[in-house]
From Swiss-Prot:
This is Conotoxin Eb6.16. GO terms for cellular component: extracellular region. Keywords: Disulfide bond, Knottin, Secreted, Toxin. Its main location: secreted. The presence of a 'disulfide through disulfide knot' structurally defines this protein as a knottin. The cysteine framework is VI/VII (C-C-CC-C-C). It comes from the Eukaryota. This peptide corresponds to allele E1k. Has not been merged with other alleles since they may differ due to geographic variation (see strain in PubMed:19606224). The gene is E1. Disulfide bonds join 7-18, 13-25. It is found in: Secreted. GO terms for molecular function: toxin activity.
């Protein structure tokens, strides 16, 4: 799984949790 990527409009960016506060994958 990747982390640190930017989320798209559906908060999808990787297989890990997407932080809506920072709009990034954690």
């Amino acid at each position: 799984t990747r982390s640190g990527g930017a989320c798209n409009s559906h908060n999808q960016c990787c297989d890990d949790f997407c932080s809506t506060a920072t709009s990034t994958c954690i």
